[in-house]
């Protein structure tokens, strides 16, 4: 994605030292699996965008599409948030496909109008017009397989252990009924919860979710587990995401496809929650975090290319991220800490950490 090891490392570094990543994966919640698959499906769609539709052998463009669809299926089979990501994936694919279609239409027009074309441009137009129809058709057919048939097979296959039971009420009809039951359940979860939070609070890291507190600690000591974001990662990431949106609107996304990739990826995983009426929690933001991290890396990459003082700023930012990770580590893992230490971590009145 970045083609530069230091910036690839920076993205990995920020994900490693984010609080939410630690808390959710350490507790073994299901969220870590779909988040991984969402990252991979978007990555391989980006790889597909960089393939040359007209100059590479057609079959070489297919593995990226196949892997994107494969991980999309695994993501949806893990948790329904994978469906949100799939919408963003579809937007990216049809944007790529639309660009190639425009190239084909433009090439046909240039050849039909018999403009004075250079030999090189005429050869390009003839190459495009000769290859597009067949390749476009085969791409669509492959996408039906990669993004419909295979994901559906994976989703149904995730019920294999249920379906293999030789007993009544263990068929595909019951699998379908379970989907309806899950949908109706989530549609009707309106009871309040002491640690619920709204979608607009998540990027600002306003409300944590408190998982555990020990009631057997000696006086002056606390053992507690919470999930929230690393303020340095989340607050900086929000600013960098806004920067990406502005850059995309200004047209920079035409030159650097990664900007739109990040913006669409974030929007697909975050905006559906705006419309969800049920009770929600900060961990629902987990799938959006990789995209604010990538927005941060894009910002620092741009800064590094333009400013000589960018390197110490980036290093200082990384030191801050690690320092906060170390400071908050006990309240993310349940390691005993003094009450005084715990009191230092309550940066916002809405945070309940112990």
Enumerate the predicted regions with their spans:
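Short helix- or helix-capping micro-motifs
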Residues: 11-16, 23, 72, 76
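Transmembrane helical bundles and short interhelical boundary loops of multi-pass, membrane-embedded
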Residues: 64-67, 97-108, 112-147, 151, ...
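Transmembrane-embedded, aromatic-rich helix segments that form part
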Residues: 81-106
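Membrane-interfacial loop-to-transmembrane alpha-helix junctions, especially the N-terminal start
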Residues: 7, 60-64, 231-233, 251-265, ...
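Short acidic/glycine- and proline-prone juxtamembrane loop motifs at membrane-interface regions
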Residues: 20-33, 78-81
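Hydrophobic, aromatic-rich transmembrane alpha-helices
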Residues: 215-219, 223-255
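Transmembrane alpha-helical segments
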Residues: 1-2, 37-49, 70, 87-94, ...
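Membrane-interface transmembrane helices that cradle and orient dolichyl/undecaprenyl
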Residues: 2, 6, 41-64, 94-101
